[in-house]
Structures are given as structure tokens and as C-alpha cells.
Amino acid sequence: NELYAVAPEVNYKFTAVNAEFDFSKNIIYAHGVRYINVGDAAITPRHGDVVIRKNAAMDELQKSRILAGRENKFHELYNCTTHVKSATRFYANGYYDYIDEMDRVQTLYFDTVYFIKETFGEAKIPLEKDFHFSDQFAFDGRAELHSNNQFLSYFGGVEILHGCDTVKHARMKILQQVDPKNIMLQVHDRTKDMDERKVVVAIASSNK
């Protein structure tokens, strides 16, 4: 069964296995909903249940999943609280797993997810989260999800982890996508640390 919201400002649609209509309260209880397409995202309701109220207002979808970029399938968020407003408008928050080259999982919380031309999300990564790209690189700042980009983009400071106790552990400023399976950080003559000091690239060796 296909359900349509005919109001032009809403105009979403989705398929349900069955639905119940409460005409006294103007409520539709839809069941067996696999996904709802909003913009370039596919939103999966928990247990396939969706509640539609007067004026096609959809109840928030708790513990839903969001496939950001349903064509390329680059990103998926889970345990989301999602508000579907129309066929091209939603906002949400949810969780995303960063899986490194050793298949270790670190979970990021995206407090902002929405669609404008593409699905976009933002997650804060504070220093106390102790987030690592890998065993060699620690990071704090923020992550951005763009559904058209294969990898998350990171804005903040990277610390190179090493055992040299005579070298200060400063954080280098980055603004780039990072492939978690193949960490390559961009360093050039304009690269600075988090205190806006120029980063010097060098090789240090020891006989120890």
C-alpha cells in the first residue's frame, strides 16, 4: 500500500504493508514501512512503524536508521531521532561508527543531521573523547558528513603519537577528508598548529 501526503508543502510518500485509520482522531498507523525517501537519504523506521497525524504531521522516528546517499550508500547512522517534514526536508541526530584499519570501532554522535541539496551532518569530537584515526594519530575538533563524499571530513587538530619524550606533542590543524583504512594527512608550507604557528616538517633519528 502506498501512502501519499498530498499537501504540496509535505508531499512525501512511502509504502506500508498495512495501515490502520483512526478517523475520530485523524491518525494513520502504518506498519511494515521499510524506508522513507527524503532528499537523497533513505530513513528506516524502527520496527517499520510510522504514525501520521493531522495535516500529514509525522511522529518523530525514534531509533531509526539513516542511509545518507541512498544511491552511493556511503554513510549510515543508527539509533537516530528523526523528524520527517516533507519529501525534501528532515532533521535528526544519531550515531555513526568510525572503523579504523584494524577494524576497531569508535562511535561518533552527530547532533545535527539534515538535508539541503545533500544530506549533511556534524559531530563534535572533544579532546576528552580520546578519539584516534589510528594508533599513530589522535584527533579533536569536529567531523562533517556529506552524503556525496565517500569519507567524513575533519576540522581540528591532529597529534602524531610517538615515543620521543623530547619532542613536544603539538596538534597540527587539518581540514580534509580522512580515509580510515588509509590515513594520509595533507601537510604543506602553509600548515599550522592549533595555535596558528607554522608547522615544520622534519625527520628526527636516534641511536637509542
PLM feature spans:
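Structural signature for solvent-exposed beta-strand/loop edge elements and short helix-capping sites
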Residues: N1-K208
